[in-house]
Amino acid sequence: VACVDGRGTGGRGTAFSRSIYCKMGILEAQDQIAAARYLGSLGYVDSSNIAIWGWSFGGYTTLMSMSMSSGVFKSGVAIAPVTDWRYYDTVYTERYMRTPQENNDGYIQTSPLKKAADLDGKLLIISGTADDNVHYLNTLQYSEALVQANKQFEMQIYTNRNHSIYGCNTRYHLYTRVYDFLQRNLK
């Protein structure tokens, strides 16, 4: 298991964190892909069995990474992913992307919706229907884009669960689902 802090993360200076301005998601995905390729080059890593997963922005990065690489990730799990920055909180998004009117090309280039046909690998997408952070619409729009691109995928929906997807047996069910998916697809 590797955790990669790509460009845009804090703690490495202004240039590093601001490099994603108006193109949030592109460089971060490139960094995940580069890290996976590097890890796959190590003798003790099976490069044909690399997966990627993330929650929220990490789910978004999973979708972007799987759509911007060919053959790098055998499978991926995207939990509560943003699929179009137009659907997300403007206070957060516009700090990095400006408004859609000011940066329309940036919004198009950074949308997994526009890259659904390029998705490579097995995908499990998970969302809660009561998510008030990354609205469920993101998952619905993305699943429709995958269907229109004739891409097969798996989806797990949690009724009345918010962005954290927890309560009663939910979190156990979620991680069991992720584990089972990875067990089936990483062989």
Walk through the language-model features, giving the residues of each.
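C-terminal catalytic histidine-bearing segment of alpha/beta-hydrolase fold enzymes
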Residues: 124, 140, 147-187
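Mobile cap/lid helix-loop segments that gate and shape the active-site cleft of serine hydrolases
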Residues: 31, 75, 81-121, 148
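Short beta-strand immediately N-terminal to the catalytic nucleophile in serine-hydrolase-like folds
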Residues: 52-54, 79, 126
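Cap/lid segment of the alpha/beta-hydrolase catalytic domain
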Residues: 1-56, 60, 83-94
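Short glycine-enriched nucleophile-adjacent loop
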Residues: 59-71
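Short beta-strand/loop motif that positions the catalytic acidic residue
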Residues: 119, 125-127, 131
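Conserved alpha/beta-hydrolase "acid-adjacent" motif
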Residues: 132-141
